[in-house]
Amino acid sequence: MKRRTFLAMSLALTFLPSVALADNIPVRVGYIADYWGTSITAIASEKGLWEKHGLDADTRVFTNGPIQVQALGAGSLDFGYIGPGALWLPASGKAKIVAINSVGFSDRVIAQEGFKSMADLKGKKIGVPEGTSGDMLLRLALGKAGMKLDDVQVIKMDPSTVVSAFASKQIDAAGIWYPLIGTIKEHVPGMVELAANSDFFPDKTFPSAFIARNEIVAENPEAVKRMIAVIEEAEDFRTANPEQSVDITAKFLKVDKANLETEAKNGKSLTSEELVKLTRDGSVNGWLSGMADMFVTFGKLKSPLDPKDYYLADYFTAK
């Protein structure tokens, strides 16, 4: 009898992993191939957090946030990552924010050697990925200098094209970010930085965020809860282990970690506990409202939603 009991238990244990796997929810998760855009995804993959929290993640790389929002709208992506410059999209109802990722200081307005101020860029060619944090910083920096977009020649291009165009001197300046700026410096060591996110902090806070397809929030809230659990645990690991997080992200992206180290220093990682507190005291909604106000000023939005209507604060603070 004891032998039969043992065999029955053994068979039950044998089938447990299959049952757990069957319970996993498949999700398609987007990321951007830089430190702040990849680190949570990389940590979750390296540390087995997807499986731990019951998700079967299909991770997909994108060049920017707006393209991910398009993919969400098309139903080909469930969750994604966006930088500050794309926050106007959830503010217009095109996605829901499930969690804040970090506060960023990676963006710069850079120029060729010899330029000394934003005023020097009048009439010059400036490359910028439209709808990104680089785009937003460019607008802020021009405004601070008493200038408008019409005072310069804005050339819309994807991030990789900005790098090659700047290196070949096809453009005079760019609104772009680290680690791409590090790559540019290798080819144009005399380039100068004319503006940075930190020039506008704390009045203007540049958060990046994780977003979800509107339909998955409505139809599969359990998937959203599990995704947030993954993000929170990965955020805690990243904040406690910054150097190891760079190593993990470099391994995931198959790049030299030196390319990510500078970018990692140009941002602030927050623990899940800190983000819960900042959510409950209204700070996060304040950041999002501040961003929305800028988007209205820049003509990106006319009537932004209230952050409570697109940031899933109740999901994030639920314990």
From Swiss-Prot:
Q: Superkingdom of the source? A: Bacteria
This protein's record includes keyword Nucleotide-binding? no
Compartments, record wording: Periplasm
Question: Quaternary state and partners of this protein?
Answer: The complex is composed of two ATP-binding proteins (BAB2_1147), two transmembrane proteins (BAB2_1148) and a solute-binding protein (BAB2_1146).
* Family per record: Belongs to the bacterial solute-binding protein SsuA/TauA family.
The role this protein plays is: Probably part of an ABC transporter complex.
Q: Which PANTHER family match?
A: ALIPHATIC SULFONATES-BINDING PROTEIN-RELATED (PTHR30024), TAURINE-BINDING PERIPLASMIC PROTEIN (PTHR30024:SF47)
Give the protein name, as stated in the record.
Putative binding protein BAB2_1146
Q: Which organism is it from?
A: Brucella abortus (strain 2308)
Lineage of producing organism: Bacteria, Pseudomonadati, Pseudomonadota, Alphaproteobacteria, Hyphomicrobiales
